[in-house]
């Protein structure tokens, strides 16, 4: 076997660039490796938000969107944009999957249950979509419409759900067609790391109306949670009961519509509702519902899909496969789906010649408790892969900046950035020994802003800041005005490979002769 000189793409998740030093964990971190690379190698800033990644103008980027754009080499119009457009055009009200579920529930005298992240965050869901769904169900004649609200506080300020809950309480009153049935923090309902002890609590809340707490209206329930010192993300499962103290349960022939459009945090709880062989926890009840997912969460999840994904051909992974190249995808649990499923344009199956390495993220309640996460183990495996000379291309994601950034803990975020910097030093050294090269970038910002200047609260959400782009390799210049979709064609060009017509991104690096 000929020894390969790998081209590595290192994605520093949640690592944006911000001039302002206030609450900027990346600026305050001691990062000698990255400082040295920026001083001595071609680098610039590229865009990972808004129209540049297929999101509405001004919308912050996120990991799913970022990796789809990175891997596909074109601007991919995201589900948020597609679904909002369908609502504007009136097509949403005629969506076959949604109409079928609502009509079936009405015909069986059942209820329409709508669940999802009630948030204007636009990362996993958008509350405007949830409102459109409630209005559509009522318009079709449903009188028992129940909202199971997952609360955010991660892609939004930590205590910001009150306005949304008040608005939806008023919406139901005006439609006279149901009510908010439960509230629960996303920590429970949207886990993606097999922490079934959390998910079962959300499942029991939705299926049986059993929560740790109860209240007669959602805003009171939220105020009680705040009094218990629970921010939105961590609100304990709370049933909203009627005047008789009765909660809402999920029954056979009801419709269950999941309004999250992003797959990774929707999969686990979806499987608990739909998989006959589900083994994550003991289910007290298993109602047979008309289940609809807003987008396809995974090929093996049973249910109708309101907005099937658009097929992306000739992504970077596919082009490498067709050229007979070998590739490695590697990350921790938290971002493994991003360097595989999302980077491959929503395809689960690995391409020929594509290996995958999953490093378990630490089992801690929140990552500020272990800001280095599993970066050392990840880097051990990555360096080993580089030294093996088996791979033409390596795609690696370091989750720390994002996952610790989401906690709002500034000191922990600084430590997270420092841990990643140390790891990058090891990777760059390993690449140098085998004649490899690397590109360093990020999918979106986060850790560069840890406090919200307007509210004074911790800033736990992503940002719309530009992200770094560094080329560690030959003498070269970098074009300005780049975006994430330019990375894949740039990589192919560095490898001397043809760029397919579907990749509309630009080549950002010009090698100096």
Swiss-Prot record:
Keywords: Glycolysis, Isomerase, Manganese, Metal-binding. One of its GO terms (cellular component) is cytosol. Its cofactor is Mn(2+). Its EC number is 5.4.2.12. The active site is at 63 (phosphoserine intermediate). Mn(2+) 2 binds at residues 13, 63, 443-444. Mn(2+) 1 binds at residues 402, 406, 462. Binds 2 manganese ions per subunit. Gene3D superfamilies: Alkaline Phosphatase, subunit A (3.40.720.10), BPG-independent phosphoglycerate mutase, domain B (3.40.1450.10). GO terms for molecular function: manganese ion binding; phosphoglycerate mutase activity. It comes from the Bacteria. GO terms for biological process: glucose catabolic process; glycolytic process. Pfam families: iPGM_N, Metalloenzyme. Pathway: Carbohydrate degradation; glycolysis; pyruvate from D-glyceraldehyde 3-phosphate: step 3/5. Catalyzes the interconversion of 2-phosphoglycerate and 3-phosphoglycerate. HAMAP family: GpmI. Belongs to the BPG-independent phosphoglycerate mutase family. Monomer. NCBIfam families: pgm_bpd_ind (TIGR01307), PRK05434.1-5 (NF003897). This is 2,3-bisphosphoglycerate-independent phosphoglycerate mutase. The lineage of its organism: Bacteria, Pseudomonadati, Pseudomonadota, Gammaproteobacteria, Alteromonadales. The gene is gpmI.
